[in-house]
């Protein structure tokens, strides 16, 4: 079930036991792929579609969203340079470009946006963001006051550096179709691009080693070095957009969840981000997920309640994973838990 469906099921469960209680639903994404869709469900926006250069240099239609006040644009690099835009047998990271990302950014600035929030998951590229830089240079924006006056925030959930054995080429390029030899060449290209950038005085050698610069085939590096972007965890950006801190001020309990909760939950996933905000606000936080693996005890140590919505349901996994089953089990779990509340 989707985040929205999980919220709806939880609300039904609460009201079946506590009909007078107010439930505020906030369907949440971690800010990766799907960022724009999630933002559009949270705040009023207007979609904008433009033709840009795709990852393999063919024209593609890229859609992003502009807040109705015209101030902020929300976009995903995958809309212009994503892996899903390239057939599996046509994936060539040695040729793939982020040029279209630069065109999207330029279009948003030309539309008058003063802030751009961009998710950089799902890339087909490994050009270090060089294509994006070229696009902005070609339209005269790269060194302009307009781009200097634009705040760019990047939803980035990987901490890889630009190059090296833990960098963009070695870690991510094989997933994009690169051979072992191409991985080595791509890494050399990224080093060369960083060196050229340093010679221009735009970055220092330390910049390429910063966490997140290797994201999206090194696009994180170009955004940081050339556009002075701020790299933030995707969930933190989404929580801010949702006005989460103010929303939970009057809450008695906050409930979050995911398909399966385990040690990876505490590595920047939605539930982890929600938990951290709740701890700051001194609010009880429940974790209700489809499955729980807490052998290390990290979940029970950080959440006030940790529970699988499928506890007591012995039906086979394929049935438990069906949307209707999951929603009913969410309703029942929440309803039963609310029997013990005094609110």
Where are these regions (language model features)?
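N-terminal loops that bind phosphate or other acidic moieties
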Residues: 1-120, 124-343
